[in-house]
Swiss-Prot record:
NCBIfam families named in the record: PRK04424.1
Similarity comment text for this entry: Belongs to the FapR family.
Protein name per its UniProtKB record: Transcription factor FapR
Gene Ontology terms: biological process: fatty acid biosynthetic process; negative regulation of DNA-templated transcription; negative regulation of fatty acid biosynthetic process
HAMAP family tied to this protein: Transcrip_fact_FapR (MF_01814)
Xref: InterPro entries: HotDog_dom_sf, Thioestr_dom, Transcription_factor_FapR, WH-like_DNA-bd_sf
Pfam families referenced in this protein's UniProt entry, alphabetically: 4HBT
GO MF: DNA binding; DNA-binding transcription factor activity
Lineage: Bacteria, Bacillati, Bacillota, Bacilli, Bacillales
Length: 189
């Protein structure tokens, strides 16, 4: 059954408000219309393309990263609350995959998660001392990986326990428990 244009546009706007990272291709499948129709609807509704939406969300939700430069974070960081939680988005492109099967290289998913765990630390020196990681399924060319990190415990020994879960859509594709060393204020003097 075809949904009338006004109703589709209302639902499109709600969907994008709920998930600003959704791609036009996914929206076209969800609403059973062409990608061009989705783009025209977005233009009429003055909704920017996904990359602009990601930048907008990021500009509103970022503390200043202390432990890394932003160029060292793998993926686009869109949310950061130091010593609490962080989110990054990585679109899997040709340079991230094996050429023969278009499956993402494991070290790319690890690098996204590890750099997010380190960036989360509210200290100028933060280093990974331990990582226990699990890959749940293959990630393919063109998929979007959303990594979510949260601090589980600030220990008294200068270490912080961080958990990172990475998703494609609603499906968890990677998770890891990281122990991050932080220098601490007393050692900076």
């Amino acid at each position: 059954m075809r949904v009338p244009k006004k109703e589709r546009q209302r639902l499109l706007q709600e969907t994008i408000e709920h998930n600003p990272f959704i791609k036009d291709e996914e929206l076209s499948k969800q609403f059973s219309v062409s990608i061009q129709t989705i783009r025209l609807d977005r233009m009429e509704l003055k909704i920017p393309e996904v990359r602009e939406r990601i930048k907008h969300v990021a500009s509103e939700h970022l503390d200043e990263v202390k432990s890394l430069s932003m160029s060292e974070v793998i993926g686009d960081m869109i949310d950061l609350k130091l010593d609490d939680s962080a989110i990054s988005v990585l679109d899997i492109e040709k340079e991230h995959v094996f050429s023969r099967n278009e499956i993402a290289r494991g070290h790319v998913l690890f690098a996204q998660a590890n750099s997010l765990a380190v960036a989360l630390i509210n200290d100028e020196l933060a280093l990974t001392t331990k990582a226990d990681i699990r890959f749940s399924r293959q990630v393919h060319l063109g998929e979007r990986v959303v990594a979510k990190a949260r601090v589980m415990k600030l220990r008294g020994d200068g270490r912080t326990d961080v958990t990172v879960e990475s998703y494609v859509g609603e499906e968890c594709v990677f998770d890891g428990d990281f122990t991050i060393y932080r220098r601490g204020e007393e050692e900076q003097a």
